[in-house]
Amino acid sequence: MFEARLIQGSNLKKVQEALKDIVTEASWDCTSSGISLQAMDSSHVSLVQLTLRADGFENFRCDRNLAMGINMTSMAKIMKCAGNDDIITLRAEDNADMLELIFESSKGDKYSQYEMKLMDLDCEQLGIPEQDYSCCVTLPSQEFGRICRDLSQIGECVVITCTKDGVQFSAKGDLGAGKIKLKQNTGSDIKEEEQVTVEISEPVQLTFAIKYLNLFAKASPLSPSVCLSMSNNVPLVVEYKVADMGHIKYFLAPKIEDEEEQDS
């Protein structure tokens, strides 16, 4: 038997919104320690990894390890039926072919119950190696989303340059070029969620397809800040915290010069 009850059901709705445009189907792996998910997008360019710890749920029960194959589009449709203040419960029997989703209003005057068919998925878990990064930038989630949206009007790729002075995002295209630079600001008069921090051991400059960064930025409602971890020639990591219960990480391989020349 698997059962997970989340008082702040809106967090689960936000997680679903953050995943559905990148991953069409995925295995939700449930153990006694929580729920995890790892999947690549259909073009195998980006990878998403989700962790929700058991202690973040009001009730969490998982009698035996369970891999639930879920159609993300179907789940998104059902999740839209839940109110933002609803309590959400996920429930499945061992070896079940259905996932039960229960939405309870916070006042207790409405109880909705849905069943969703599970899929048989053959998912290969990729080992994500531990990595020390040359540069880690933390900035407001909304600011990151705005930068990605703005520069996507200019070009299809964004160059992220990280130095001790700050981080710069730049793009160029047929209409011209644009760049946005953020300097570190961590003063006591600045709210924590509005701060920009840069931890750097060596300068980094990498190029990425901006359409993926725009998809990652859909996780912005989950957390007031986002962390970008970079090193030359390794995938970028974009990490959002999920309340006090876990995180969602996106991995995106940088574009190499040959690819950039073909795109231009």
Swiss-Prot record:
Residues 61-80 bind DNA. It is found in: Nucleus. The keyword Magnesium does not apply. One of its GO terms (cellular component) is PCNA complex. Keywords: DNA replication, DNA-binding, Nucleus. Its main location: nucleus. Belongs to the PCNA family. Homotrimer. Forms a complex with activator 1 heteropentamer in the presence of ATP. This is Proliferating cell nuclear antigen. It comes from Styela clava.
